[in-house]
Amino acid sequence: MTAQLDDLAIELPSWAFGNSGTRFKVFGTPGTPRTVEEKIADAATVHRFTGMAPTVALHIPWDRVDDYAALGAFAAEHGVALGTINSNTFQDDDYKFGSLTHVDKTVRQKAIDHHLACIDIMNQTGSRDLKIWLADGTNYPGQGDIRGRQDRLAESLAAIYQHVGDDQRMVLEYKFFEPAMYMTDVPDWGTSFVQVSALGERAKVCLDTGHHAPGTNIEFIVAQLLRLGKLGSFDFNSRFYADDDLIVGAADPFQLFRIMFEVIRGGGLEGRGERSDGEGGAGSDLALMLDQCHNVEAKIPGQIRSVLNVAEMTARALLVDTDALAAAQEAGDVLGANGILMDAFYTDVRPAVARWRTDRGLPADPMRAFAESGYQDAVSAERVGGTQSSWGA
């Protein structure tokens, strides 16, 4: 089980290390990064203690710099690499009524050009994925032409996709509501799947675990998209009500376990052209990323805890006796099949995962090791003055 954890790599979002909050308040914290370089340094610290977070995702324009080659070199010096490039078409006044779906061709072209600029950044950073999440939608029935907006979205995505390189991908994220309340232009996995399927093999779906209605069977969506070869990436977080962006696994660790079981079942950790059960299929080169906002808790420990939660639920999912499970399923043994799954879920894997870390020269307890490292006190003393990174900065 532990050897298979070597395949687990969790990308960290640069914005998780900046200040964030709610529509009521954004709280500042000592030591918060003021530059993208300081965000990368914090992300590299998470990787140094966990060994499972080798890349950092950037958000444009929040993380815009003049020299991306130099930024990549800075990241490499700190033991990580630059990863997914995330676009932003939700913080400009021109996008009040939409971006890629806007009725005004000039606004649509502005949004398209932003994504082309993101692809240019990818060419400089060596990033594989361009991630698109759109706030586009409407608040009232009749406000917009639902079908017309889908047509414009398809045209805009096609204009972007033709610039995606042979070794690059576009991933389209969906969200069932917010900020739009009546109709969101990419509200569900079906819409994302339809749009990316029309583009080509290098267009995939991004699944954010907090972007579903309560009670949604997310692991079914995972299984289906992996089956179709269209699940490109995850945004991991946790939620109690809506898109809460809490630490992954905090609200429902059993759900995270079930998701990771289907990821493993579909070959999502292998990144090769066949499924782990040997049945063939599209396989996956799946990206696992955190997308969280640490509004009240400390940011670096919050990211460490998140990585540990994914690792531990993955380890539990790897313990499922799949042969016994298949036999019970084929025999119609309802309770037996459920029991096999639950036995794995209830197994305490923390000692085994700790051994995995120590065998690789990592601390057995990353949370404690970070707390004792003095890193937070050091950056709190050093990062005085300037403007702390936050939404839009």
Predicted segments with their positions:
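Histidine-acidic metal/acid-base catalytic patches
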Residues: 1-17, 24-27, 44, 142, ...
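Catalytic domains of carbohydrate-active enzymes, especially glycoside hydrolases
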Residues: 3-12, 29-62
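Active-site acidic/histidine proton-transfer and metal-coordination neighborhood
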Residues: 4, 82, 94-200, 204, ...
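Glycine-rich, aromatic-flanked loop segments that form ligand/cofactor-binding clefts
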Residues: 7-17, 60-90
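N-terminal small/glycine-rich loop or linker at the start of catalytic domains
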Residues: 8-27, 87-102, 134-140
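Short, acidic/polar
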Residues: 29-46, 112-120, 215-224
